[in-house]
Amino acid sequence: MSELSTVARPYAKAAFDFALEQGQLDKWQEMLQFSAFVAENEQVAEYINSSLASGQISETFIKICGDQLDQYGQNFIRVMAENKRLAVLPMVFDTFVSLRAEHEAVKDVTIFSANELSQAQEDKIAKAMEKRLGQKVRLTNQIDNSLIAGVIIKYDDVVIDGSSRGQLNRLASALSL
């Protein structure tokens, strides 16, 4: 996995730098996301890993993507195909998103809850996390049916367990001492 990220990083960085320079971060993120989705398709993955000429592979890939790619996106795909790197497009997309979040000083925060959070609850958590971290946050809410109530908040290597399950586990540990 780390080898793939090593291969993907220069492509993601080049795409990010170009998109930033052109003021088209959203467009490039959409193009890379779509391209990554196409590259993950089982039949497409077999095709791009075949022994066909890179020009043929890139043109077919571009046709599949249709008008989702502008001329610069198409050139990007051609370069990746020429270097036999189309298979790492999903990792290129992930790295691009990370570079963008880093540039925009946005921290990705995942909230695990027993139920879907309301917009007001998400806003309250976002505000508290922004104050704690000193930067903007992008929240992702995931439902975890094993939680009784409360939430578990994760970012980077940090876990904040505010769930009832976590409280019960801590109480059980304290009682067993």
From Swiss-Prot:
Record has Signal as a keyword: no
Cellular component GO terms held in the UniProt record: plasma membrane; proton-transporting ATP synthase complex
InterPro entries the record matches: ATP_synth_OSCP/delta_N_sf (IPR026015), ATPase_OSCP/dsu (IPR000711)
Record's bilayer topology term: Peripheral membrane protein
Compartment list: Cell inner membrane
Subunit structure: F-type ATPases have 2 components, F(1) - the catalytic core - and F(0) - the membrane proton channel. F(1) has five subunits: alpha(3), beta(3), gamma(1), delta(1), epsilon(1). F(0) has three main subunits: a(1), b(2) and c(10-14). The alpha and beta chains form an alternating ring which encloses part of the gamma chain. F(1) is attached to F(0) by a central stalk formed by the gamma and epsilon chains, while a peripheral stalk is formed by the delta and b chains.
Family note: Belongs to the ATPase delta chain family.
NCBIfam families from the UniProt entry: ATP_synt_delta (TIGR01145), PRK05758.2-2 (NF004402), PRK05758.2-5 (NF004404)
Name used for this protein in its record: ATP synthase subunit delta
Organism: Actinobacillus pleuropneumoniae serotype 5b (strain L20)
Gene expressing this chain: atpH
